[in-house]
Structure formats: structure tokens, C-alpha cells
């Protein structure tokens, strides 16, 4: 990412052009023996990652040597620096080899892009925890209980999501409990059921053919609407909620009506005074694969023609929104198409930034073309990394589409560092020497930052979310290619451009009557010849040395910085307790998707009642034993007394069976009597057939009941509800299990914090170890750890203020945060502790002078790389920008403001 620039005085001093031909070495230096240090004049050495602190002068003979200033542990860094020095010389001597080799490798690996997935992405597999309890619970339910959607369908008894279409109707008046509004809703219902699909072979698919049925009729989309359609005299002003009693049946209204105003109690229900919204649910056949395929064809037709159908009905009393079991998948796949145009914009912006950053008025030292190729080399790394992963069969998920934007911003940082080091070399040296010197100064630093960032990503492989795993694998691998191409083909391009510098310099110095001095002055400002001793300091470096650094080290500025940090950390900690957990499934679609208003209406009017949860007796127990029944009844009571359960809506076959046995005068405590009467009971209550699993040996191996969940609109309530219900089941004396298909997604709320903390701890530990091994000063490791923790707290806290949930997508960014925090803090703190300045304030100023601009440049380039995602219409892309902006902003603030000030206090 970023690297320390060479210190002032590190520029190689060349001789005048009259003594030495350009492009040739001043003189042949004697190479140091293996293991020896090459002598460097004291005034030419400064702190850098590759040279360490300046060498000490030997004391005069007879005087005691002063104590060393600090511990210096460059046992790994020094050999790496020497190795890169040799490698740079090799690249400089063979530029075409190192240019064409990576190009051929990219072309070869790029063939893997033909394996980009063309099939649907499984949302459950990618965005729910691996090995979650709910998935094991589902396997148990599927293995012990059956359903029948062609004869006796029950939505609460299904173990996985069925095919369905859903319409939410909202009254424009205060209440829809009026005959006129019911007529309009009935007209809408009839139009939906009249939809038919004409297939290519001419056959038709009718709703009545694919609907889930109870006996011979399609399951009603709304039980009250169905009753009113068959009995228009039904008094809509005399209803009770959540269950309405009629002389012939009980009508279950919970979940079908929302925005209710309730009156006085009537038994276990309350009078329904007003209701603002109604739900219509059209369940379709799912169990048989052929039936499911036909159902999905009907649903596709429903989605394609619903808006036209709605317009033709001219609905005046109601507003409607719609959704289907296919919608989430289809809309999620559509979001990937919205981000493709942003790739082009991102590359244009980065190229412009690179050109501006690398342009010089001096046409010899100008590196605009080199910068453009640097961006191109980043694109090569994306092609190579993605191609390799696809060749290896690593799944490409949509969230991976964020990766190229990040790689683009990160990759050009290495380019800036290498160009900066090259500009510090002398034109009097050979190309081989110049590249060797450049590599020795920056390649180790680039290596360290690459290792830390790649380690941060690869720790994401330990996540329980496959989408996080795949994103981290793709991005970490691509970063390795980005690093490899930087030190090979980009270095080769710098070497080739160095030959251009030499050729142009010779042309400018050559007396030629055909070229006027005016033309020469256009290439060399003010007509001066090129400086062979290296480029002068960049104006931004001077800004940090002469203005920003001295200002930041004043007493008033330090006081303000401390207050600012206190405000920052308090706000961040407060935000950490406000952040919402889990991925809201509506966020998988684009902002202008039709499912967004559907979920908004559902949240506004239907959040009071959640799913019906199965309470499953997982083993064979003696139901005829009164003690066992009491234990089971005690557990059911504990469920009903939970704040998230409506105790009046419990459904359990055993309770109904005990009433049946008592009314018939049979003894429920006798095993034979208990078992022999179940068949007769099921004839009266056939729906319970699917709740009792009786083996061939006439033994109840498992059974289930149902409880109604309420008040779980927020992710925190869903998490607490899930954990509480499982705790009750686990502590029950009878072996119990709770399950609903929604738990598959609810499990992410329980797993996300655990996964985030684990990944952050693993990555932070890895960063700490790397800093101890590769940064030659132990004190730096402490400041690196402090900065990582501080930035993570800040990013997490401010996520809440920016309406970003802690989910699998933001968890990726928190892992990224660790790598960037390391980069920003490690360079500044090391430059500080390595400084030879006499006072802490001057040490801080020198650190900012050497590294302030690289830190700022790194942050800006990365933000530019991802800023185009802010224009995306999809949450998963926009969130990536938000968190990366926070990471860059807070990381740069720590590197440029907080750490330089805090270091002066110790």
C-alpha cells in the first residue's frame, strides 16, 4: 500500500555531464563482501525501512563510545533488502523478459474468465453461516416429518421455503374493513388467479393447476377474504383478532391483517376496530420437481405482468405491492449488472489521478505514460487473480465484484512508491543501478504491506460465511499478483522509460542548429538542463515539513487533537452499541427494485407477528406417562411465557388429543389405550397427521407443536428470540428442538459478532507478529496494535451512524481495516522512533515530512478507486464504499494526526 519515501540526502550524487556520459555509472564502486555493510556518508543517510537508523560515527581514540540510541532488529529486513537490490538489477538488465513474461502469464490465466458463473447464485449458501444450528434442525425435520402440498398443505409445517406470490394491500382510507374495499381486493384476487402461462408448445399453466391445495381447493390467499367472497353478508365491523369465531369455523387473522386498531377483549381475542393493510398469499406446489418448475413458470409470468394487470384494474381505494419466492434471487442477480458501468468510470478516475500525481513540467522526468501502464498492470493482476481462482474452481459470488475497485486503489499505491524512488536516483547511473537502488529502498516496504494486507484477507477464510471466504480468497490472491506485477513488469517499464530519459537528455545536450532554444525550454523549464542528482523534494513533502508538522506539534494543536480523539473514541464506542446485526434481505436488491416498497410496507404494517415456530420432541418419550406430560407441559408454558411468544396461539396435537381422550372417557395413562386411539383422533383432526411420526413398531419417535412469534421486527429482537427459544428447549427435561425456515437467516444474527471478533483477533495477531518480525523496532508493534484497535472501534461505531449493519459484507471491510490500519500506523511510528532528531516534536515533524504525503496519497487513491460505488443503486456495493471511506479517513487521521501527536507524549 504505502511505503516510506527515502530520506533527504539519500539521493545518489552524480558528477557533471562533462565528466561522465549520461546513463553510465560515475565510477565502479567496489562491491562489499558478503555480510559486510557498504559505507554510507552520515549526512546522506536517513531513516528508512531498508537502511534503518543512520550509522553512528566512531568516537576518537581513547574515548568511550556512547550508548546505542535504540534496539535495532533488522535481522530479516536487511537480507530482504539485499535480495531485492539484486533482483532490481536483474530486472533492469532484462526489462523485456520481465515485461513479456507477466503479459503471457496474464493471457494464460485470463482464460479462466470463461468459467464465470452463468447459473443462479444460492443466497442461502453464500450469506448464511456454514454449519448453522438451523440447517441441522432443518435436516432433522425433513427426515422425520412429511408434508403434502397437493392435498393437505400447511405453510407452518413446511421445512423450507415454498413457491409463493405475495401481495400487500394498503387502504387509502383509515381502514379497509369496508365492503367497497373488499370488492376491489376481490377483483384483484380474481385477476391474479386468472393469470395463465402459455408455453412454447402451446400448453397452458393455470393457477388452479399449480396452487397448493387443502383437499380439493386451492389454499385461500386470505382466509377472511375467502369467507367474505362466499358470504358477502359477513359483518366486517364485528371481527375479532387474532382469531375470529364464526358459527362454522375459526378464521386465523394474525399475519394476514396489519396496521390494526384493537378494542375490548372477547375471550382470547380483541375486537378488530380498524385495519389498514391486508396480505394475500398465493402458495404454489413445491415438493415435486416437475410441479415446482411449472409453479416457477407461473410466478415468472406473475412478476412480468403484475404491473400491467394492476394498471388495467384501475384500483382507486387501495395501493398494492408485490413479491414472490423468486424475487429475491432475481433482483439480487440484477444488481451485478448495475455495477458493470462503474468499472469504466473507476479506471478513468484512477488513470487521471495517476497522471496528475506523476506528471512533471520536466518532460524528461515526466512519468505520465508510466503511470498509465501502472494502472494497466493493476488490471492485469485482476485478470490473473480472478482467472486463476476460476481455473481452480473457486466460486465467483456477486460480492466479489467489489474486489476490482479495491485492488485498483491499492495497486496504484505501489506504483507511486516505485516511481518516487526512481525519481530519487541519478541519471548519471546505469539503468541497472538505478533500478537496483530503487528496489533496495522500497521493495521491502512494499513487501511488508503486501504481506500484511494479504494476511488480513486470508484470515477471512476462517469466516463462517462462504461469501466472505470467497471474497477474501479472490482479493488476497489478486493482491499477490498485483505485488508480483509491480516488481516485475512495472519495474521493467520503468527501466525502459529510463532509457527514454537518457536518450532525451542526450538530445537536449547535443548542439543542433535545427532546434531552437525555445523548443528546448518547452521540455526543460526555463531552459535548464536536466538535474542528474535526482528530483527536488515534492511540494507536499515540504508542506508537511514546514507547515503542517510545526503546527501539529504546538501545545494548542496537541490539546485540540487530544479533545478530538476523546470525542472520536467516545462517539465510536457509543456507536458500537447501536449497530444493527445481520444482513437485511431487502438490501440484496437495488434501491429501485419493486421488492423494496414491499418490504417497507411489510415492516410498517406486519411486523407484529413473526413466523410460527415448530417445537419438536426429537426422541421417543412415554406420552402416556403423566409425569412426562407434565414435564412437557412445563416446557410449553415456558415458551408461552416468553416475551416473543403469543400464548393464545399455541397449537399442539397432544393438548387436543388429551381433550379428545377425556371427552371419550378413555384412560390416557395406559400405553395401549393411548396408542390405539390416535388413529381415530387423526380422522377428526387430519392436519395433525403431519405432526406425529409413528414407526412401524407403533412407537411415536418424534412429534411437534407450534408457537406464534411476535414483536421481532429488529435484528436484535430476532437474535434474542432465537437464543432464548433454543435455551428453553435445551434446558427442558424432555428432548426438544425449535425450528422455522426463517431461522436459516436468523442464525446470521447470532453468528456475525462471533465471526467478526474471531476474524479481527486472528488478523490483528497476524499483524502484530509480522510487525515484530519485519519492522526493525519493537516499539512500533505497540503503536500498530493501538492504531488497529482504535480504527476498528471507530469504523464499527460510525457504521451505525451511517445506517450500515454489521453483516457479512461489512465484516469483510473490518478485516480490510486491519491491513490498512497497519500500513498507515507502522510507517509513521517507525519513522518517529528511527529519527535522530533531538526532540520528540522534531521527530514527529520528520516522520510527517518523510511519510505524510505517501499516507495521504494512499488514502486518496483508494477512496478514488471505490468512490464510484457510492453511485451504485445496490446496498452491497454502496456499503463497501461507505466502510472503505471510513477506513481510509480514520486510518489516515491516525497516521497524520493522532499518532504523530501521541508519540510526542512518551
From Swiss-Prot:
Naming one, the record's GO cellular component terms include:
endoplasmic reticulum membrane
Occurrences of domain SSD (ranges): 339-496
**Highest rank taxon of the organism:** Eukaryota
Q: Where is this region: Disordered?
A: 1-70
Its placement in the membrane is given as: Multi-pass membrane protein
Q: Which InterPro entries match?
A: Patched_domain-protein, PTHD_SSD, SSD
Q: Where in the cell is it found?
A: Cell projection, Cilium, Flagellum membrane; Endoplasmic reticulum membrane
- Known glycosylation sites: 148, 235
Which UniProt keyword terms apply here? Cell membrane, Cell projection, Cilium, Endoplasmic reticulum, Flagellum, Glycoprotein, Membrane, Transmembrane, Transmembrane helix
Transmembrane spans: 338-358, 370-390, 392-412, 442-462, 476-496, 559-579, 760-780, 782-802, 814-834, 848-868, 883-903
The organs and tissues expressing this protein are described as:
Expressed in germ cells of the testis (at protein level).
- Coiled coil spans: none
Q: Which family does it belong to?
A: Belongs to the patched family.
Query: What is this protein's function per UniProt?
Result: May play a role in sperm development or sperm function. However, does not appear to have an essential role in spermatogenesis or male fertility.
Q: Which PANTHER family match?
A: PATCHED DOMAIN-CONTAINING PROTEIN 3 (PTHR10796:SF60), PATCHED-RELATED (PTHR10796)
Name of the protein in its database record:
Patched domain-containing protein 3
